Amino acid sequence: TGVQTCALPIFTGYENGTITGDAELIKNYIGEGYFFRALCYFRMLAYYGDLPIVTKVLEDNDEVIVENSKRTPRNEVARFILEDLDKAISYLASRGKFNGQRVNREAALLFKSRVALFEATFEKYHKGSGRVPGDNNWPGANMPYNSGKNFSIDSEVDFFLTEAMNAAKQVADNAQLTTNNHVIEPQPGVITGWNNYFEMYSQPSLANVPEVLLWKQYSFSLSISHDAAYRVKTGCADGYTRTFAESFLMKNGLPIYASNDYQGDVSIDNVKAGRDERLQLFVWSESTLLDSDPSAPQYSQPFKKPGIDNSNQEIRCITGYQPRKYYTYDYTQTPNDELRCTKI
């Protein structure tokens, strides 16, 4: 159904010249159609591998449907997805046109890189399993509609890796990254502007953050809200695992088991000390400032401890490693479950 929905405007309207209106907007909409068709096929590729490629609206006829239900080898499906994304890239406007709030050229390039990397690594690491076209035990080799096809798995892997690198490079070379200024928490009374990297995940607008390619804006006045920032403050029966926390390196680049600077895990403060600053920024610990906004009831108080033993699931952290990512120190955004900050 998703494929048909994407195909209809592309094949029945644009190519026939029957769609009228602003030419630039129409091009962008068609680009979105190719993007979402590629997304539909990518999801099916991940689930099924080999699958039919349908490039037109089919008649409601059993013979026609059966004829078009022949499974195409997965590498050809992946190439088809990349072709759709190339078309999307050629039609879509850049991120700046709609401030990153619509599918854009850069987002399509990044998605192309993801698709290509997925297929390259799948074929590389599943070679010989019977799931890759070219394997001796690949079931598709016995299908008459694949007769005469030859597959070089190594060549396909090289092709997809190259496509992934080229697409990603076009995005990375033109995206200004948000700088982490190494400030781990604000001073009391400082609400915003203390660390742009931390605030990137919860500020009201990301229009001027070029590295965020696609984002959704929330508005309390329009009754469009979410509760992520409030929930990470209260616990919400969530939490990072100990294994995840231990996977972060020390700031000197060493793993915790190889560093004399690791202070152990008697407290979360100890766990975070001297570690990768992403762990320091995005996990609450005993001394972390809870509220810096003077209007907040718990202004200038420390977090103290996660509610790991609390029977109320809404304010319980089930692991003790309570996320601080997506939190905002603007109390007007977090008095209750209705938030207006952005979502990436």
Range-by-range predicted roles:
Residues 1, 7-48, 64-105, 268, ...:
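Conserved, well-structured interaction surfaces
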Residues 1, 49-51, 55, 86-87, ...:
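An aromatic- and glycine-enriched ligand-binding surface/loop that stacks and positions planar moieties
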Residues 44, 112, 119-121, 331:
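Enrichment for repetitive, rod-forming helical segments
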Residues 56-62:
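Short, conserved phosphate-binding/catalytic loop or strand-edge motifs used
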Residues 61, 76, 127-128:
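Primarily recognizes Gram-negative and organellar outer-membrane beta-barrels
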Residues 62-65, 143-145:
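Short acidic (Asp/Glu) and glycine-rich catalytic loops that position anionic groups and cofactors
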